[in-house]
Amino acid sequence: MSFYTLQAEAPTIVALYRAPAFIEFLAALTGQRLQPCPDNDPHSCALYFYTEPGDHIGFHFDTSYYRGARYTVLLGLIERSSSRLVCQLFKDDPQRQPRELQLATHPGTLIAFNGDKLWHAVTPLGVDEERVSLTLEYVTDPSMHPAKRLFSNLKDAFAYFGIKAVFRRSRSSKAAANPGG
């Protein structure tokens, strides 16, 4: 469920995402000056539902097209599953011994990381299991090259939220910003 849906249907979640005290806490945790992603980023604040057997996300980096770093914050909401967040620390670092963590995201569990640097996955959901996580994204620099914004929008449209959700929102955001033209 994208940021756009949460804005309309769950404003309290968006208020938490934007709360100055919460952002200050995360900045202290990461050692970075953080800010929310721009309003045209559907991943900035999103709910991810795992409800069908086999639901998972394979190993990946949270590739960011922002000019600065992007930090991912996961907040466990529902954890009735054997599914785990698997993190492989020090992947491709010849100076350090690789280490794997498998983390349950029980309700209230908060996990923060730089998604561009952490190789991670969510293991497959079992039968009659359910997992729901709130994902919050924060950046050190919210600017993005226009070509990378287009690529990011296409990825979001086809891999995550659907064409209508991504591009309808982009058009309505532009119209609101430029009502006369």
Language-model features: where?
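Short, ligand-facing micro-motifs at secondary-structure edges
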Residues: 120-121
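Catalytic core of non-heme Fe(II) oxygenases with the double-stranded beta-helix
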Residues: 12-14, 24-117, 129-133, 140-149
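Non-heme Fe(II)/2-oxoglutarate
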Residues: 124-181
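Non-heme Fe(II) oxygenase metal-center motifs and adjacent flexible, charged/small-residue loops
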Residues: 1-5, 22-30, 156
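Intrinsic disorder/low-structure terminal segments
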Residues: 2-3, 112, 166
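Intrinsically disordered, low-complexity regions
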Residues: 3, 38, 160-163
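A glycine-rich, hydrophobic loop/mini-helix early in the fold
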Residues: 1-16
